[in-house]
């Protein structure tokens, strides 16, 4: 293992164990619109795909490290297979998710923690697969922006808002209405994959992932 790989693993170890950071509080009011919600699915792939992303990871605004992410997805089966690698191709984590269940295929410490793998795959799912079920409400506003809201019985929710011209924003809130994840998507879109994505996590760990699409295919 090179010195660079060692530093990268140390940095990501902080990400794996960082806990208890303050969440961003923002109450969900929900869209007061109803109608066609098909536009909310246009920002996600509808067929099987494989993609490669350059990932810039930062914790609490500090040092940024570059990683590579390889993801294979099957929207119809709600399935994901992901690899997290160093720029040199050293595999840090390989995992899959199907029907909400996560399985670790390969991991080096400290990434062999089930909690870390589960959290990472939930982030991957938020980025690449549409929320489960049907939106509770949705519609299109006068300014052309579209909004959809998925609400769960426990009070948590996922909201998608935006347009192809202005970009999209995905917000996930917990049972208390605190924002735990925010995703920004900007085109162009290639088979439902945004060229530029940014995930901001606020709770329980604070970090940011900026993804740039390098390659996409079936």
Segments and roles (model prediction):
Residues 91-96, 114-118, 180-183, 207-210:
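A short, polar/proline- and glycine-enriched secondary-structure boundary/capping micro-motif
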Residues 84-88, 97-101, 106-110, 164, ...:
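A mature extracytoplasmic/lumenal domain signature
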Residues 30-54, 148:
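Post-signal peptide N-terminal segment of mature Sec-exported envelope proteins
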Residues 16-37:
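Bacterial Sec signal peptide processing site at the extreme N-terminus
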Residues 103-132, 136:
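Acidic/charged, solvent-exposed loop-and-adjacent secondary-structure segments enriched in E/D, K/R, S/T
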Residues 145-218:
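Gly/Pro-enriched, hydrophobic low-complexity segments
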Residues 1-21:
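Sec-dependent bacterial lipoprotein signal peptides
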Residues 45-105:
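N-terminal mature ectodomain segment of secretory-pathway/periplasmic proteins
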